[in-house]
Amino acid sequence: GPFDPSHRYETSWLLSPGALFAYRATLSTYAFIATFVNLGWNGTHGGTAGQSFSYFTNLTFWGLSFYFAVAAAHTGTYWLTGRPLLARWPRWCQELHAIFYSTITVFPFIVTIVFWAILFPGYFETTFAAWYNTTAHALNSVFALVEIVLPRTQMRPWWHIAPLIFLLACYLGLAYVTRATEGFYVYSFLDVRANGSGVVAGYCFAIAIGCFIIFALVDGIIWARVKITEDVMGRKGKRS
């Protein structure tokens, strides 16, 4: 059957398509501005702009930036023409968009939890560092949570966990490639010499298990949202 016959990815139970488009476009614009300002600041203040893509935080924030841009395009085309761009794509692209949605509703929470629980140094040295870290390690999860609650998306299939774990494994490989080529550990808890292989493996398994738990919790929120907004409140989505 059709991938998304009632256009759940492009509509909201609360906002009109035009308002949802504006919201998503605004978030994408802010996220891209924050990303490029961070690159510019680090590049001109003796920072690590050249190592930006080695950090899971930054990769996840790039993902959020592009997701909201693509989601805005889908919602905008639905708003203007009645047929979203997503509906015109081949099925495999539609499935990739669904997986994309799963990544941006799981990975930001992992980033936030790991940073504040393990990596946060206790203070920020500059106002800029406070702003960007708050954006990338706190607002990222706010953006993700709103994208869970606001649209009409349904629960994701459980097989989406497989590409999520695969992407985490790919990042783990990237972290050690960075160690081999750049000479530093992106995250201190990945340092085998300092922590021991058992501790590092424990961190990796804990993050993988956390991915499962967050995925399940997010699906629970989506299930509750669908039940409350559609079955109880009778809001089947604003289509115009």
Where are these regions (language model features)?
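Membrane-lumen (extracellular) interface motif
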Residues: 35-59, 116-135, 148-162, 177-198
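Aromatic-anchored segments of alpha-helical transmembrane domains
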Residues: 32-36, 110-117, 167-177
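Transmembrane-helix exit/juxtamembrane "anchor" motif
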Residues: 72-80, 213-235
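Transmembrane alpha-helices of multi-pass eukaryotic membrane proteins
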Residues: 16-31, 50-67, 71, 92-108, ...
